[in-house]
Amino acid sequence: MGRLQLALNVEDIDEAVTFYSKLFSTEPAKRRPGYANFAVSEPPLKLVLIENRGQGGSINHLGVEVEDVDTVDATQSRLAEAGLASVDERGTTCCYAKQDKFWVQGAPNGEQWEVYTVLEDSMTFNAAGADDDPCCCGTDEAASVHGTVAACC
């Protein structure tokens, strides 16, 4: 696979960016209002910060960023063969990027895991274009799976 993604809810995006820039000795790869992501090389990590007041200090979701759509498909097939269900999202907009992804179902503690690849950059945070909405689940089916705003990207 590619690299692990950790998406955190933060109270103050500017304060969080300052802290994580120092922690990982790097600047954000992408910065938008209420949003930042870091492509950390060592350790290999995609760190996503989502300003979500009242939810700071909690995990938004976890993910694995992979190189291409073929890897998304192969991973989804492998997990299906292992008995894990998933919810497919193709061509969805999330975190200022158009993505092909799926959400893995059945984590024992309810964690939200996505496996995704970025197809292209986007000027909007999510599919609806509501940049102030910290949820970008993309489809009604995925939104019903993820439940609350804090539980999905």
Segments predicted by a language model, with ranges:
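Short, positively charged
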Residues: 16-18, 77-87
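Core segments of cupin and vicinal oxygen chelate
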Residues: 2-46
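Short linear motifs in intrinsically disordered
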Residues: 25-30, 67, 91-94
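Acetyl-CoA-dependent GNAT
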Residues: 50-53, 118-120
